[in-house]
From Swiss-Prot:
PROSITE patterns in the record: ANK_REP_REGION (PS50297), ANK_REPEAT (PS50088)
Top-level taxon of origin: Eukaryota
UniProt source species: Homo sapiens (Human)
Biased composition annotated in UniProt, kind: Basic and acidic residues: 372-384
A Pfam family recorded for this sequence: CCDC144C
Designated name of the protein: Putative ankyrin repeat domain-containing protein 20A3
Swiss-Prot/TrEMBL keywords: ANK repeat, Coiled coil, Repeat
ANK repeat copies, ranges: 66-95, 99-128, 132-161, 165-194, 198-227
Amino acid sequence: MKLFGFGSRRGQTAQGSIDHVYTGSGYRIRDSELQKIHRAAVKGDAAEVERCLARRSGDLDALDKQHRTALHLACASGHVQVVTLLVNRKCQIDVCDKENRTPLIQAVHCQEEACAVILLEHGANPNLKDIYGNTALHYAVYSESTSLAEKLLSHGAHIEALDKDNNTPLLFAIICKKEKMVEFLLKRKASSHAVDRLRRSALMLAVYYDSPGIVNILLKQNIDVFAQDMCGRDAEDYAISHHLTKIQQQILEHKKKILKKEKSDVGSSDESAVSIFHELRVDSLPASDDKDLNVATKQCVPEKVSEPLPGSSHEKGNRIVNGQGEGPPAKHPSLKPSTEVEDPAVKGAVQRKNVQTLRAEQALPVASEEEQERHERSEKKQPQVKEGNNTNKSEKIQLSENICDSTSSAAAGRLTQQRKIGKTYPQQFPKKLKEEHDRCTLKQENEEKTNVNMLYKKNREELERKEKQYKKEVEAKQLEPTVQSLEMKSKTARNTPNRDFHNHEEMKGLMDENCILKADIAILRQEICTMKNDNLEKENKYLKDIKIVKETNAALEKYIKLNEEMITETAFRYQQELNYLKAENTRLNAELLKEKESKKRLEADIESYQSRLAAAISKHSESVKTERNLKLALERTRDVSVQVEMSSAISKVKDENEFLTEQLSETQIKFNALKDKFRKTRDSLRKKSLALETVQNDLSQTQQQTQEMKEMYQNAEAKVNNSTGKWNCVEERICHLQRENAWLVQQLDDVHQKEDHKEIVTNIQRGFIESGKKDLVLEEKSKKLMNECDHLKESLFQYEREKTEGVVSIKEDKYFQTSRKTI
C-alpha cells in the first residue's frame, strides 16, 4: 500500500491517498476478535486487566485475531492507567500488529501523547517502520503535533528516516502542506537537500503542491534553486508548467539576489546576465502577442514543460549551438554577453537560457527595426552586413532544424527515457507500471512523431520563404542608400549650373539610374506587399491547423492521463491485496508452526494423561462400586424400616377402629335398652308433663350440645377419610419412588459400565441424592400424617366419651325428673 503519489496536478490524488492511511481514530474493534484482557484494555478497566493477569500471566502479550496486544488497544484508546500497568509488568513494548505498527506508532497515530511519552520513557524504539515504511515521526508530522515530534526526536528518532517513496519527514511535511512542521524540522537541522525517488528536492515539491509559504521558508534557508530532477527540470520549470506566476516570481527574485551577491566576483557582466535571464524567463511564459514565426516555433517545441527532453537544458543548448560546427555562438549578437560570465552557477543558468534565446529569435520577425537601422547606418560596410546576415540566416535555419530534429528525436526517444526513469509523470509505482505505461504512450509517441514531422516540413518551407523575402528586403534596403546618394548628387548638380558639360552628362546618367532604381524599388515593394499578404493568409491557415492539432493533443493527453490513473489505481489495489496476502500468509505460517508445536506438546500430555486416567478410572470404579453397595444397603434398610413403621401404624389404626366399633355396638345395645325404658316411662312422663316443662329448657341445651357433638363427629370422620386418602397417596408416592430408585440404580449400573461418561454418573448421583432428599421429605410428611391421625383418633375417642357421658347425664336428668314428678 502506497501512502501518496504525484500523479495529479498539485497533489490532489496524493493528498487523498495520504488521508487513507493517516486518518482515523484507531482500530476497528470487533468483540468476537478479542479476549478478556483485550476487552478490559479497550474499556480502560485497569482492575480487570490486573485480575486477568493474576489468573493467567501469559495473557500479558496475548494476541487477538488481528495480532494486537492489550498494549496496542490501550494506546489506541488513550487509557494511560492500563498502559502504565502493562509496561510495569514488563510486557513486549515493540511488538507489531498486522500492519507492522508498534504501540508507539499507534499512540502517535491516534495523537495520544501521554501514552507515547510513557512508551518512550520505558525504551520504545521510535525508528521502527510499519508496512508503509512510515516511522512514528511521519505520523507526528501528518498530525502536525510539534510536541510529539519534539519528544520523538529527544528520544533518538531519526530525522532523516525514509518511507517507501524515499520521503524524509521534511519532504512528507511539504507534501502534506504542513507549514508549521516544515519550520519546526528545519529548526531541528533537517536536511533541506534531501530528494525523493524522482530526485525532486524540497523546493520542487513545494512548488508542485502550490505552497507559496513553504517556498518562501525554503528560499530563506538558501536552498539550491538550480537543482534538477531526473528529467532535468528545476523548481522554476515546475512553476511555469503549472502556471504558478507568484511562485515563479519568488524564485526569480531569489535568483536575482544570488546574482547580486556574486556581483563582486563577476563584475559588470552580471547585470547583462540578469537582464537576459529575466527577459528570457518572461518570454518563456505563454503570451498572446506572439505572431509571425512564433507559431512555427511553438509547434516545433513541446507546449508543456512537464514533458522535458532527455538531459539538462544547458547541455542541449551547447549541443544545438555547437552541433553543426559551422560557426561559433559569438556570431549571434544576443549571445555575446552570456559568454563573458565566469561564475559557474550564473554561467549554467545563462547557458540554459541561450537555447531559449535562440528559440525566441525564431519567434521574432526576421527583419527587425534595429537591424534596418543598423543597415542604414553602415553604408560603408554593406557587403559585410550582407554576408553576416546571410550567415546569421543560415545559422538560424540550422538551429531551427536542430531544434525540430531534437524535438522529433525527443518524441522518438521519450519512451526510452521513460523506461530509464520508469514514468512520464511522477506516479506511485514507476517500476511496476512500466509495461502498462509503455503501451499507453506508444500510440501517443507515433502521433507526436507524425505531427512533428509535418510541422517540421511546414516550418522549413516557411523559413525558406521568409529567407527569400528577407533577402529581397535587404537588397531593397541596400539600394535605398545608393538612390539617396544619387538624389543628393543630382540636387548638388542642379545647384551648380555653371559646371562643365561632363558634370551635366553625369547628372543625367545618375537621374536615369535613379529612375531605374526607383522603378525597381517600387516593383520590389509591390512584391513585398503581395508576399506579406500571402504570408498573412498562410499564417491564418496555419493558426487554424495549430488549434486543431492542439485540441487533438489535449484530448489525447486527457485520455492518456485517465488511462494512467486507472492503471495506477489497479496496480495500487493489486499491490495492496498482494501485501495483505503476504502478511496473511506469514501470519498463517507462524500460526501453523505454533499449532504444530502445541499439537506435539498436547500429544505428549495426552499420553501421560491417559496413563493417569486409567489409574484414576480404576480407582473411581472401585469407589463407585463400594458407594453403590453402601447406598443400596442403606436404601434397603430405609425401605424395611419404613415398611415396618407403616405396617405397625396401620395395625394400630385397625385395632383402634375395631375397639371403636365394639364400643359403638355396646353403646347401641345400651341405647336400645334405654329406648325400652323410655317407652315404659313415656306414659309416666305424660302424666308428669308439668314437671317436664321446667326441664325442657335444660333439655334443649343438651340437644344443642348433642348436635354440636354430632357435627364434631362428622368432621372427625371427614378428617379420618382425608387422612386415609393421604395415606393412600403416600403409599403411591412411596411406590413411585421405589420405582424411580430402581430405575436410577439401573442407570447407575449402565453408567458404571461406561467409564468415559463421568458427567452422567455425577448427574445420576445428584438425582440419587435428590431422591433421598425426597424420601426424607416424604417420611416427614408421613410422620405428620401419623400425628394427625393419632390426634383425630384421640379427638374421636374423646367425642365418644363425651357422648356417652352426655347420654348418661340425660338419663340421670330424666330419672331425677320422673322421680320428682312421682314425688
